[in-house]
């Protein structure tokens, strides 16, 4: 793989990570409600889920999801239901502003697992990776090394972008002055979770 080819993938991966989705929403809500440490656990979970998708694509299971309507639909509806459930929980969250106390309500391990599930149940991610990776793989060169390069690039880029979203969320949290504002913010992010879940439910198999 040439540097130019890798750089083209780097730009593509960056644009994709910057696009707001369930991962970004999950990172921002976790950062606001549980601080940087909670956000770090969430980001680690997202990258673990993304890494699993990359491995599945590497062993050929990504093609299964891109070609099998049943597999795609099962994962799609599971993901949509989970995001909508998260949205309802966020919508109903109390308007607490003591972030130190709020951070104790969920362990970082639980936030980590939640983020893994957010990424794993997104069929569009694995289908897109299955379609994208082959476009940047040079058949005349060792494919495993190229998959590793693309996979590591994808995870590092997404981790940096999600860290940016977490930092942005902390800036937003600094503007919150009372429980009413916090509750309104929880409702806003809850609505976004449900919207993304609804959009995922409406996604069609390519």
Swiss-Prot record:
GO terms for molecular function: homoserine transmembrane transporter activity. It comes from the Bacteria. The chain crosses the membrane at residues 5-25, 45-65, 68-88, 117-137, 148-168, 182-202. The keyword Cell membrane applies. Keywords: Cell membrane, Membrane, Transmembrane, Transmembrane helix, Transport. It is a multi-pass membrane protein. This is Homoserine/homoserine lactone efflux protein. It comes from Salmonella typhi. The lineage of its organism: Bacteria, Pseudomonadati, Pseudomonadota, Gammaproteobacteria, Enterobacterales.
């Amino acid at each position: 793989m040439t540097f130019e080819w890798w750089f083209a993938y780097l730009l593509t991966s960056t644009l994709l990570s910057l696009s707001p989705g369930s991962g970004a929403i999950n990172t921002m809500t976790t950062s606001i409600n549980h601080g940087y440490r909670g956000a770090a656990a969430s980001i680690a979970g997202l990258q673990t889920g993304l890494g699993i998708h990359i491995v599945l694509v590497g062993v050929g299971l990504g093609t299964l999801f891109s070609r099998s309507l049943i597999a795609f639909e099962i994962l799609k509806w599971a993901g949509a239901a989970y995001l909508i459930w998260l949205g309802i929980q966020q919508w109903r969250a109390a308007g607490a502003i003591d972030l130190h106390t709020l951070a104790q309500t969920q362990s970082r391990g639980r936030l980590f697992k939640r983020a893994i599930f957010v990424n794993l149940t997104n069929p569009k991610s694995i289908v897109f990776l299955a379609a994208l990776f082959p476009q940047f793989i040079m058949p005349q060169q060792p494919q495993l090394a190229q998959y590793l390069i693309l996979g590591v690039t994808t995870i590092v880029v997404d981790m940096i972008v999600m860290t940016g979203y977490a930092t942005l969320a902390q800036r937003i949290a600094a503007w919150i002055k009372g429980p009413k504002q916090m509750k309104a913010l929880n409702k806003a992010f809850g609505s976004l979770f449900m919207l993304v879940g609804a959009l995922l439910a409406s996604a069609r198999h390519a």
